[in-house]
């Protein structure tokens, strides 16, 4: 996906959670181009965790200079989806 620049539009299009594998698939739109990344979800003694794949981690890190709260936003949307709450997609992460 490369480095994200200030003129990009980045939207989170969907979050899909597989209850059996505990994998979560994220679909993003970066300037109209689709990118899919994965993470592994864990809940141990009521402590919730999201372990990003290496590719997703790099992508998130490239967005952080432009949107420092991107990890918090992504985490919130992830848990809302897993808990069955209504999420209005797409979620704009970067852009106008």
From Swiss-Prot:
This is Cysteine protease immunity 1. It comes from the Bacteria.
């Amino acid at each position: 996906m490369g480095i994200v620049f200030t003129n990009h539009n980045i939207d989170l299009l969907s979050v899909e959670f597989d209850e059996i594998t505990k994998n979560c698939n994220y679909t993003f739109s970066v300037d109209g181009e689709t990118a899919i990344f994965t993470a592994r979800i864990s809940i141990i003694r009521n402590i919730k965790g999201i372990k990003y794949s290496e590719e997703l981690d790099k992508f998130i890190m490239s967005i952080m200079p432009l949107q420092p709260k991107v990890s918090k936003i992504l985490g919130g949307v992830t848990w809302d989806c897993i808990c069955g709450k209504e999420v209005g997609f797409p979620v704009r992460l970067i852009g106008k």
